C-alpha cells in the first residue's frame, strides 16, 4: 500500500536504516487482535481499533509494529540473527492528534550478545534522531526490568506478589500503591465471615481440608462443578488471593525496595551505585548486575554519548512484553517522547517460535519528530 503524507525526512531515515544493515519489511494493516490483547499492555489495549472477520475472528488495525514484525519472522521461518527495519502507519485512539500516524524502527532478532545488541539499539536510535535534530541535545532515560525483578526476588516476596510488582513496573503510582499494601496487609476478615471462620479453624492452611470443605459445600448447595471451576481450582485461587492480601513485607525490606526505586542518576555512575546498594542491602543480584555492567560498557563502545543517558530504577514502558532494557529518548525543549524501545526476549516464544529468540528494538514517532524539527527551525 503506498504511503502518503510522509514526513519530508522519511527518505533520509530509510537511507539511515539501510546503512545500519537492516532488512526493510512491511506487515498487513489488519492484524489478529489476540496477540496485542494478550501481550501489549493495558495502556495500548484500550487504544486499539477492533473489528471482526466474517468468521467471527477478532481483528484490529495495526497499533504497533513489534508484534507484527515478530509474527512475520516466525511465519517466514527466517533464520537469525536478523535486523528488520519498518516504516508505516499505526492506528491508535488518542486524546490529541490523529488516530493514524507513522512509526518507524528497527527490531533486532536473534543476537545472543545481549549487552552488545542492547547498546546497538540505543546507539542506533540516538544516531537516527541526531541526524534529524542536529542542533538539539537528546535526553535518554534508561531502565532495566531484569534488575528490578532480581531485587524483588532477593527481597523474598512470594511469586504472586512478584508478578503483581513486575506488571506494575514503570507505573510509579501503582508501584507505590502496591508497596503500601505490602506495608499494611489486610486481615482474612475482609474476604467475608465464612473465610474468616475457615482461617480461625485452620482450614485455609490445609489445602486438602479446604478442597474437601468446598466440595461438600458445593454438593450441599447443588452447585455443579461441571459448570465452573473445580473445588481444587477454587481452593488454589482463594489461597493465592489470601497470600497476596495478607503478605507483609518487613520494614527493612520495604526500605530496600524504596531505596532501589529512588535511583535516578547518570548512567556512568549507575554500576558503582547499584553494586554498593546490593552489598549494603545484602542482596544476591550478581547476575542481573553483571549484565547491567556489560551493557554500560557496550554503550560506551558503540559511541553513544553516555552523558546524555540517565538510569532510573523505577522507569519502565507501558508494554507487557518487555523483559530487560527499556529506554526512551526526548529532545531538550520538546516534551514528547521521540523514540522508545527495549528488550523482549520472551515475546517470540509466546507468539509461537519453536526456539528461544532473544530480541531488542525501538520505535520512532515520526509526527513528533516532525514537530520537533519544525520547532527547531529545520526543514
UniProtKB/Swiss-Prot annotation:
It holds the Pfam family tRNA-synt_His. Its main location: cytoplasm. It is found in: Cytoplasm. Pathway: Amino-acid biosynthesis; L-histidine biosynthesis; L-histidine from 5-phospho-alpha-D-ribose 1-diphosphate: step 1/9. GO terms for biological process: histidyl-tRNA aminoacylation; L-histidine biosynthetic process. GO terms for cellular component: cytoplasm. GO terms for molecular function: histidine-tRNA ligase activity. It comes from the Bacteria. Signal peptide: none annotated. Keywords: Amino-acid biosynthesis, Cytoplasm, Histidine biosynthesis. HAMAP family: HisZ. Heteromultimer composed of HisG and HisZ subunits. Belongs to the class-II aminoacyl-tRNA synthetase family. HisZ subfamily. This function is generally fulfilled by the C-terminal part of HisG, which is missing in some bacteria such as this one. Required for the first step of histidine biosynthesis. May allow the feedback regulation of ATP phosphoribosyltransferase activity by histidine. This is ATP phosphoribosyltransferase regulatory subunit. It comes from Sinorhizobium fredii (strain NBRC 101917 / NGR234). The lineage of its organism: Bacteria, Pseudomonadati, Pseudomonadota, Alphaproteobacteria, Hyphomicrobiales.
Amino acid at each position: 500500500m503506498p504511503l502518503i503524507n510522509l514526513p519530508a525526512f522519511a527518505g533520509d531515515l530509510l537511507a539511515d536504516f539501510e546503512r545500519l544493515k537492516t532488512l526493510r519489511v512491511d506487515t498487513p494493516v489488519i492484524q489478529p487482535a489476540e496477540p496485542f490483547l494478550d501481550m501489549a499492555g493495558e495502556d495500548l489495549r484500550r487504544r486499539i481499533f477492533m473489528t471482526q472477520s466474517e468468521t467471527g475472528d477478532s481483528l484490529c488495525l495495526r497499533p504497533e509494529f513489534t508484534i507484527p514484525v515478530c509474527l512475520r519472522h516466525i511465519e517466514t521461518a527466517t533464520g537469525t540473527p536478523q535486523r528488520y527495519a519498518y516504516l508505516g502507519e499505526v492506528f491508535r485512539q488518542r486524546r490529541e492528534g490523529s488516530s493514524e500516524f507513522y512509526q518507524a524502527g528497527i527490531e533486532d532478532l536473534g543476537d545472543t550478545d545481549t549487552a552488545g545488541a542492547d547498546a546497538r539499539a540505543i546507539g542506533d536510535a540516538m544516531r537516527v534522531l541526531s541526524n534529524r535534530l542536529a542542533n538539539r541535545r537528546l535526553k535518554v532515560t534508561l531502565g532495566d526490568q531484569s534488575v528490578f525483578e532480581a531485587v524483588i526476588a532477593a527481597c523474598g516476596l512470594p511469586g504472586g506478589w512478584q508478578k503483581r510488582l513486575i506488571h506494575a513496573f514503570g507505573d510509579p503510582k501503582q508501584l507505590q500503591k502496591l508497596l503500601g499494601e505490602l506495608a499494611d496487609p489486610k486481615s482474612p476478615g475482609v474476604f467475608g465471615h465464612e473465610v474468616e471462620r475457615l482461617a480461625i479453624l485452620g482450614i485455609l492452611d490445609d489445602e486438602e481440608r479446604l478442597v474437601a470443605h468446598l466440595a461438600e459445600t458445593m454438593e450441599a448447595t447443588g452447585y455443579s462443578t461441571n459448570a465452573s471451576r473445580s473445588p481444587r481450582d477454587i481452593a488454589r485461587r482463594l489461597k493465592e488471593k489470601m497470600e497476596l492480601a495478607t503478605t507483609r513485607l518487613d520494614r527493612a525490606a520495604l526500605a530496600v525496595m524504596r531505596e532501589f526505586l529512588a535511583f535516578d542518576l547518570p548512567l556512568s555512575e549507575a554500576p558503582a551505585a547499584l553494586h554498593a546498594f546490593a552489598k549494603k542491602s545484602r542482596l544476591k543480584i550478581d547476575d542481573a548486575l553483571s549484565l547491567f555492567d556489560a551493557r554500560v560498557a557496550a554503550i560506551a563502545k558503540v559511541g553513544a554519548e553516555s552523558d546524555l543517558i540517565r538510569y532510573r530504577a523505577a522507569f519502565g514502558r507501558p508494554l507487557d512484553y518487555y523483559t530487560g532494557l527499556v529506554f526512551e529518548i526526548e529532545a531538550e525543549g520538546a516534551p514528547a517522547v521521540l523514540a522508545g524501545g527495549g528488550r523482549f526476549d520472551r515475546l517470540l516464544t509466546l507468539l509461537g517460535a519453536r526456539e528461544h529468540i532473544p530480541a531488542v528494538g525501538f520505535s520512532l514517532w515520526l509526527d513528533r519528530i516532525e514537530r520537533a524539527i519544525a520547532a527547531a527551525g529545520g526543514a
